Amino acid sequence: MIRLVTMGKSSEAGVSSFQALTMSLSGRIGVGNVAGTATGIAYGGPGAVFWMWVITFIGAATAYVESTWRKFIKRNKTDNTVAVRRSTLKKALAGNGLRCSRAAIILSMAVLMPGIQANSIADSFSNAFGIPKLVTGIFVIAVLGFTIFGGVKRIAKTAEIVVPFMAVGYLFVAIAIIAANIEKVPDVFGLIFKSAFGADQVFGGILGSAVMWGVKRGLYANEAGQGTGAHPAAAAEVSHPAKQGLVQAFSIYLDVFLVVTATALMILFTGQYNVINEKTGETIVEHLKGVEPGAGYTQAAVDTLFPGFGSAFIAIALFFFAFTTMYAYYYIAETNLAYLVRSEKRGTAFFALKLVFLAATFYGTVKTATTAWAMGDIGLGIMVWLNLIAILLLFKPAYMALKDYEEQLKQGKDPEFNASKYGIKNAKFWENGYKRWEEKKGKAL
């Protein structure tokens, strides 16, 4: 998987595998990795972390299927939006059903889900720097507007620069905190595993909550099953669909086992968390009196090693995490809108979408966290249900592509995709590419 990330180069028609990876990571790494992980611990106990890890393997499989199928249906090399027009849903739905699903995705990505990211930025900046939410909202939409009006290629370039930087910085802080509390390693991991199976005396009564919140927050953090990573995957320049499917599966592992785990370990190693029984409202463990579940746990954890720095650092990190997630949301909304409107009307439609997206983002910054999370949960539910239906129906061809890819590797080949082998019609991009590969092979002989 790691080798595949470095393969392929960007062009005027598409992006490299590395750019596609960073674009998908910009969507996966967000509020869910910081605030979401903390709320998982708050309502599911330390055992929720284990179930976040477990759901990762299922999430990686779904990411492979959805991304590989998106590469199946790439039609040409000159339009990144057309590359994803005929999505996985086309095989699951038909006629008006497909159009309605596209509209629902646009609603989720452009209206319902950006607010929760923007709200988290506003809250963290208010806590760390005392900046009013209104001021933060104006700043966020100004920077976001510059990015999305710059075009999809600029999104790829921005993600390529920002995502590795913010993730590495966040991980270095986590490593420093773990090193400072290294003697707690056996106790913390023992607590995670015991709590995950109800064997811990303190958290044994919330075993069901540990599983539920671990799965919920794990899915929210890595966006597995939502189809978001498939959009940048479709724009990547590769010779076989399975290559990007595996790259996107790898992005799930990076997201959870590095960023989510870093957040969880910072919180647990420092003991900066509360655990609440969601059913009864009883506080089982209270280490942070008066602190609401969310990014405040992570801020307090970093403050234990870097007093006065924790809140500011997490606020800045959360800004990058949430901001890159938001412009990834816009990219997805735009590619789906391209399916619904004619090419001559796309300019106007995209401009209107940008305005709606910025308005929804600003709305999220000035509203309460409860409102923002409620809207985000609705959007998340829409994305997951729509995409899982398609994944179940399209698993077989994606699996066949993986076997084809592995067989070619065993033969010492750089895998090339033959669309006709899978009965995929009108896949001109892959048909022409395979013909060129066959011609080269014939000349070599």
Swiss-Prot record:
The keyword Transport applies. It holds the Pfam family Na_Ala_symp. One of its GO terms (molecular function) is amino acid:sodium symporter activity. The keyword Nuclease does not apply. Its main location: membrane. It is found in: Cell membrane. It is a multi-pass membrane protein. The chain crosses the membrane at residues 41-61, 103-123, 129-149, 159-179, 188-208, 249-269, 304-324, 349-369, 375-395. InterPro entries: Na/Ala_symport. Keywords: Amino-acid transport, Cell membrane, Ion transport, Membrane, Sodium, Sodium transport, Symport, Transmembrane, Transmembrane helix, Transport. One of its GO terms (cellular component) is plasma membrane. The N-terminus is blocked. Signal peptide: none annotated. Mediates the active transport of alanine, driven by either an H(+) or Na(+) gradient. Belongs to the alanine or glycine:cation symporter (AGCS) (TC 2.A.25) family. This is Sodium/proton-dependent alanine carrier protein. It comes from Bacillus sp. (strain PS3). The gene is acp.
